[in-house]
Curated annotation (Swiss-Prot):
GO annotation, cellular component aspect: mismatch repair complex
Record's keyword annotation contains DNA repair: yes
Family annotation (InterPro entries): DNA_mismatch_repair_CS, DNA_mismatch_repair_MutL, DNA_mismatch_S5_2-like, HATPase_C_sf, MutL/Mlh/PMS, MutL/Mlh/Pms-like, MutL_C, MutL_C_dimsub
Annotated organism of origin: Escherichia coli O157:H7
Gene assigned in the entry: mutL
Identification of the protein by name: DNA mismatch repair protein MutL
Keyword DNA repair: yes
Organism lineage string: Bacteria, Pseudomonadati, Pseudomonadota, Gammaproteobacteria, Enterobacterales
Length: 615
């Protein structure tokens, strides 16, 4: 058979084999086009599981009459124009293949009107050459796409369609995923003339949990822990279910989005699973709805025919970022049981962590339990006090316990003979537990502090080094080891290998786990403060240091590591300085009482004040 150019219809049908797998694939492509057009309302009508009819109507910007024919042509799109656009894609579609592929295996009709046009126009393609016919029509601003008799001209594909119920369930799942991605869009889904789903838009700043509950169910909502995590250009937000209460049914909720695009990414799933593995059984899976925002230049979405997968340019960074974000919210959720007193005490009141550097010292207040990760709290009844926004919401509770908790909260506390008040320091004395208030950043790495009218300078890199040393030094329990996604394998000499074997127990207390063979050592886990470090530089230097030692004390090794860690902040900001000082005050109180000279230096203002007065 000679080489020949395939007819347009056959070429489109071949492309449809990748894009149009089943009716749900058609719905996904068309709804994503509506979202790219700026629609705020999308109505989806399905008949016979999508095999008979798929109708998508939106109120987006519409398509101009002159561009209708192009819209049904292959490789025609308004979303990209150059390679630079492709490498930083932010729209859901970009290849320009969907409409041409769908129209080649169905009877597709496209009706659209823009705000500038007085009338709407309708286009459809037919025949071997896919000639497009355009005619006037009646239609509001927006677009309607009707897909009739899917796979009518490809009997083999139609034969592989499942039952009407199964195909509609796939469509329903696609709409659920899209509705979770765009809370600002109203989506209505009907099947055989009956409304099945109505997802109302959530206004900016509104309660997204209401829609989350409508999609994922109240069981997920009651166990959902809210996540807000950011590092540089990476942002992670959403919800992860408490692993201690995750059921097999709940574990079916696994939705992940990258820049608003729904994904099935093994790297992301691995990071989440690894963060939850201590609380999940071997055969359990986590439940989550997570949104990852990343610089579009750092992710390639053009790696899968149906755009279900992406490739990250810095996959290790993304994995560790997600792992730490999920792990942090799970660690906040853990509560250490408090010893029971002989007499009942008032319920603990969660307060934010210490931020004396910003102007207030919460450590001067009565001790309370640590706040847990935020969960969803149901909205109050009409006329009651509004519930707090979810970042500050109280822990969720099981339905059967709700009434009991409500009664307990409404029951007045029994009268008790007041205890003699214990002597307490006045509130101002709490300043002894803090460095003071951050006024500004000087020379990019020093914080100018004010305390009791005195001014001092604090070296932020030195404070960070002290904090890292405390975080690395094992207490009653060893430092928690964080497994590396890609273990680090290094070649070592006989002397270095011998030193590592002698220091193995001390390194294990610091959270550093390794395996050694004849001439190599493989680092399998490191403590959390080392996750963002360049381990290919730090670990060889650490091995060289150990080879020169005769005694291996965890404290000395932790001190050496802390002194050799690279700071994550070349230019310190006020927020970073405040956060650092709060952590140092909490974990290193001895530094506040007796700060070393290399950390804190007082600034004498008297000569300057005297000079001003003399003038």
């Amino acid at each position: 058979m000679p080489i020949q150019v395939l007819p347009p219809q056959l070429a489109n049908q071949i492309a449809a084999g990748e894009v149009v797998e089943r009716p749900a694939s058609v719905v996904k492509e068309l709804v994503e086009n509506s979202l790219d057009a700026g629609a705020t309302r999308i109505d989806i009508d399905i008949e016979r599981g999508g095999a008979k009819l798929i109708r998508i109507r939106d109120n987006g910007c519409g398509i101009k009459k002159d561009e209708l024919a192009l819209a049904l042509a292959r490789h025609a799109t308004s979303k990209i124009a150059s390679l630079d656009d492709l490498e930083a894609i932010i729209s859901l579609g970009f290849r320009g293949e969907a409409l041409a592929s769908i129209s080649s295996v169905s009877r597709l009709t496209l009706t659209s009107r823009t705000a500038e046009q007085q009338e709407a126009w309708q286009a459809y393609a037919e025949g071997r050459d896919m000639d497009v016919t355009v005619k006037p029509a009646a239609h509001p601003v927006g677009t309607t796409l009707e897909v009739l008799d899917l796979f009518y001209n490809t009997p083999a594909r139609r034969k592989f369609l499942r039952t009407e119920k199964t195909e509609f369930n796939h469509i329903d799942e696609i709409i659920r995923r899209i509705a979770l991605a765009r809370f600002d869009v109203t989506i209505n889904l009907s099947h055989n003339g009956k409304i099945v789903r109505q997802y109302r838009a959530v206004p900016e700043g509104g309660q997204k949990e209401r829609r989350l509950g409508a999609i994922c169910g109240t069981a997920f909502l009651e166990q959902a822990l809210a996540i807000e995590w950011q590092h540089g250009d990476l942002t992670l937000r959403g919800w992860v279910a408490d692993p201690n209460h995750t059921t097999p049914a709940l574990a079916e909720i696994q939705y992940c989005y990258v820049n608003g695009r729904m994904m099935r990414d093994r790297l992301i799933n691995h990071a989440i699973r690894q963060a939850c593995e201590d609380k999940l059984g071997a055969d359990q899976q986590p439940a989550f709805v997570l949104y990852l925002e990343i610089d579009p230049h750092q992710v390639d979405v053009n790696v899968h025919p149906a755009k279900h997968e992406v490739r990250f340019h810095q996959s290790r960074l993304v994995h560790d970022f997600i792992y730490q974000g999920v792990l942090s919210v799970l660690q906040q959720q853990l509560e250490t049981p408090l010893p029971l007193d002989d007499e009942p005490q008032p319920a603990p009141r969660p307060i934010p962590e210490n931020r004396v550097a910003a102007g207030r010292n919460h450590f001067a207040e009565p001790a309370v339990r640590e706040p847990v990760a935020p969960r969803y709290t149901p909205a109050p009844a009409s006329g009651s006090r509004p519930a707090a926004p979810w970042p500050n919401a109280q822990p969720g509770y099981q339905k059967q316990q709700g009434e009991v908790y409500r009664q307990l909260l409404q029951t007045p506390a029994p009268m008790q003979k007041p205890k003699a008040p214990e002597p307490q320091e006045p509130a101002l004395a709490a300043n002894s537990q803090s460095f003071g208030r951050v006024l500004t950043i000087v020379h990019s790495d020093c914080a100018l502090l004010e305390r009791d009218g005195n001014i001092s300078l604090l070296a932020l890199p030195v404070a960070e080094r002290w904090l890292r040393q405390v975080q690395l030094t094992p207490g009653e329990a060893p430092v928690c080891a964080q497994p590396l996604l890609i273990p680090l394998r290094l070649k070592v000499s006989g002397e270095e290998k011998s030193a590592l074997e002698k220091a193995q127990s001390a390194l294990a207390e610091l959270g550093i786990d390794f395996q050694s063979d004849a001439q190599h050592v493989t680092i399998r886990a490191v403590p959390l403060p080392l996750r963002q470090q360049n381990l290919q530089i730090l670990i060889p230097e650490l091995i060289g240091y150990l080879a020169k030692q005769s005694v291996f004390e965890p404290g000395n090794i932790a001190q050496w590591i802390a002194r050799n860690l690279m700071s994550e902040n070349a230019q310190w900001s006020m927020a970073q300085a405040i956060t650092l000082l709060a952590d140092v005050e909490r974990l290193c109180p001895q530094l506040v009482k007796t700060p070393p000279g290399g950390l804190l230096q007082s600034v004498d203002l008297h000569p300057a004040i005297k000079a001003l007065k003399d003038e």
